[in-house]
């Protein structure tokens, strides 16, 4: 299947403002592109591309005073298959984990494991190791937090989501990640596109989505505590310890987001053609 995705973002700056952007698709999905995915600017801006320590495709710019619009639109191939559920994936002993995975066991800005460890062990220590434990954590978070756009809070941590019991997709992800790490399961934050493909249309405006991945059986596996069901058509943009590492923009100076439009939709198949 084909998916068309993109965005239009507007920023208002009072002075030249350096910015870091994580707005490209993840390098692991480049081979699936059916058209170029290029960031365009409505101002004469030079962008420098680089790969961060987590392997994300990032950009550096200096936004001029006034309004700057950043946009992209592309088509990408997707298998059309839902997320894989690795029922038999085993949990590694700490000493068997690859070196580059260990960082995803540690607490981070939004995943405050030290405040959740006692609860996590009391609640999940009796569950089977491996995927069954991840699913138990996912089930808990899905039932514990109520999704509410009006309760979004960029300062809320995993423990904040635990106590507030409300939030948006990043809050589901942060709490689930923190609980997994408490139980010695490496977990990392993911951001990207997730359209209403194969599910009822959400009447709310489209947004970027957040989910997470766990390292079991030698591989990273997709998990979504907000929806708690395999979904179709994820397009990964970035991975990191938490939302800090994959913020769509980080401005080193005053910058106001004045426009935010995200699109993700399946491209109708032409009659007589198959993907």
For the regions a protein language model found, what residue spans apply to each?
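Intrinsically disordered, low-complexity linkers and terminal tails enriched in Pro/Gly
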Residues: 195-197, 271-274
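Hydrophobic/aromatic-rich core segments of domains that either
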Residues: 139, 171-259
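Intrinsically disordered, low-complexity N-terminal segments that are enriched in acidic
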Residues: 1-89
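Hydrophobic helices that insert into or interface with lipid environments
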Residues: 238, 274-275
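Glycine-centered loop/turn motifs
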Residues: 66, 127, 201-203
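Secondary-structure boundary elements
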Residues: 13, 76-80, 86, 96-167, ...
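Short intrinsically disordered coil segments
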Residues: 24-26, 86-95, 226-230, 252-254
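Short, surface-exposed linear segments at secondary-structure transitions and domain or protein termini
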Residues: 44-47, 94-97, 230-239
């Amino acid at each position: 299947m084909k998916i068309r995705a993109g965005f239009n973002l507007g920023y208002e700056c009072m002075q030249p403002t350096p910015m870091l952007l994580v707005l490209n698709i993840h390098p692991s999905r480049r081979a699936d592109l059916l058209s170029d995915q290029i960031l365009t600017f409505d101002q004469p801006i030079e962008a420098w591309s680089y790969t961060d320590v987590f392997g994300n495709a990032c950009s550096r710019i200096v936004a001029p005073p006034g309004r700057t619009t950043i946009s992209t639109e592309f088509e990408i191939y997707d298998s059309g298959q839902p997320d894989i559920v690795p029922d038999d994936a085993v949990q590694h002993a700490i000493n068997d984990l690859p070196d580059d995975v260990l960082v995803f066991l540690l607490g981070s800005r939004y995943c405050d494991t030290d405040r959740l460890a006692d609860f996590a062990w009391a609640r999940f220590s009796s569950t089977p190791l491996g995927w069954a434990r991840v699913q138990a954590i996912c089930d808990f978070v899905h039932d514990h937090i109520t999704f509410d756009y009006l309760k979004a809070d960029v300062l809320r941590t995993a423990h904040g989501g635990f106590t507030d019991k409300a939030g948006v997709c990043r809050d589901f992800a942060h709490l689930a990640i923190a609980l997994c790490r408490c139980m010695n399961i490496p977990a990392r934050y993911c951001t990207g596109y997730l359209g209403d493909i194969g599910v009822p249309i959400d009447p709310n405006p489209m947004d970027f989505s957040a989910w997470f991945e766990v390292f079991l059986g030698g591989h990273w596996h997709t998990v979504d505590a907000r929806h708690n069901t395999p979904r179709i058509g994820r397009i990964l943009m970035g991975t990191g310890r938490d939302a800090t590492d994959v913020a769509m923009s980080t401005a080193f100076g005053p910058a106001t987001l004045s426009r935010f439009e995200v699109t993700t939709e399946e491209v109708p198949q032409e009659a007589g053609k198959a993907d």
